[in-house]
Amino acid sequence: KETKFLNKITKHRKLIKYSYGKKNSYIKILDIKKINDEKKITFKLKNKIYVLKTSLIGEIQIKNLIFAIIAAHLSRLKIKDILKTIHKIKTIPGRIQKIGKLKNKSKVFLDYAHTPDALKTVIFDIKKEYPLADISLVFGCGGERDKKKRPIMGSIASKFCHKIYLTDDNP
């Protein structure tokens, strides 16, 4: 959906489009391997292979990281300098942010997902990252706004989580 819309805009306005992942993309992702709490991303840029390590979680954060590399490279930064720095990027507070580890080695994440789509994305990203894990979710939909989303978010939580701790306000 997004791609068709962007293709139409870029063609109509004669803009140059940069993308990743596909055959004729600026960056082609060759492999993503999970090693402990890190990802090793192998990609191709201008017929050269590069490797990047990151602790970011989730498809959106990885996409943003790749587009940051593209933007930096298009700004004439050398790829070796980009790769020296890019691995230091951490998640934005409140966006699939790892905030702890329990005695049983369970990981604790914080995300301020406030829409049904955002909640589902977070749950799916964590499930992809830790496919064998049971997800326990603490969430609330406080305030007087947008009461219609509460049952939808509750349904998503009950469908995809092992345990739910529902609060009467934002936890």
Locate predicted features.
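Acidic, Mg2+-coordinating active-site environments of NTP-dependent enzymes
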Residues: 1-108
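Active-site beta-alpha connecting loops in nucleotide-dependent enzymes
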Residues: 92, 116-119, 124-171
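Catalytic cores of large soluble enzymes that bind and process phosphate-bearing ligands
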Residues: 57-60, 74-78, 114, 145, ...
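Hydrophobic, well-ordered secondary-structure elements that form the walls
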Residues: 96, 111, 164
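Generic detector of well-ordered alpha-helical packing
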Residues: 65, 112, 169-170
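Conserved phosphate-donor/acceptor-positioning beta-strand/loop module used by diverse small-molecule
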Residues: 1, 111, 167
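Switch II (G3) loop of P-loop NTPases
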Residues: 108-114
